[in-house]
Amino acid sequence: MARTKQTARKSTGGKAPRKQLATKAARKSAPTTGGVKKPHRYRPGTVALREIRRYQKSTELLIRKLPFQRLVREIAQDFKTDLRFQSAAIGALQEASEAYLVGLFEDTNLCAIHAKRVTIMPKDMQLARRIRGERA
């Protein structure tokens, strides 16, 4: 559709402004007591999307090093006591573990989307592992 030039028109009156109700007028004229401002809140999902973009850009490890190291030592004790680990070995285990978990969560998210949901559930993770052949 072609754009046309707008010309100024003189207003021909119109409706008179309505009178405010007494309650509205009283509410507007009442002074704000305390002056406490509500803290700013982002809409649901905004922060989540920002975090997704941030973590997809980054390459750093997401699990803290010491808790992961304690977990590895605790699991290793079931197989052999007094095992010692090089720091590089713990680092390699952590890299592999995080790569596995990220991939599993990606597949889990695809399963949830396939079910027309945006929230992942345990059944999505079970399905992802079953399709991968990790669990019968």
Swiss-Prot record:
Xref: PANTHER family: HISTONE H3
Q: Give the protein's recorded name.
A: Histone H3.3 type 2
Provide the function of this protein: Variant histone H3 which replaces conventional H3 in a wide range of nucleosomes in active genes. Constitutes the predominant form of histone H3 in non-dividing cells and is incorporated into chromatin independently of DNA synthesis. Deposited at sites of nucleosomal displacement throughout transcribed genes, suggesting that it represents an epigenetic imprint of transcriptionally active chromatin. Nucleosomes wrap and compact DNA into chromatin, limiting DNA accessibility to the cellular machineries which require DNA as a template.
Q: N6-acetyllysine is carried by which residues?
A: 5, 10, 15, 24
Grouped into one coarse class, the protein's main location is: nucleus
Positions carrying Phosphoserine: 11, 29
Give the sites modified to N6-methyllysine: 5, 28, 37, 80
Can you state the subunit structure given in the record? The nucleosome is a histone octamer containing two molecules each of H2A, H2B, H3 and H4 assembled in one H3-H4 heterotetramer and two H2A-H2B heterodimers. The octamer wraps approximately 147 bp of DNA.
Give the UniProt subcellular location, in the record's own words.
Nucleus; Chromosome
What cellular-component terms does GO give this entry?
nucleosome; nucleus
- Region annotation Disordered: where it falls in the sequence: 1-43
Native source organism of the sequence = Caenorhabditis elegans
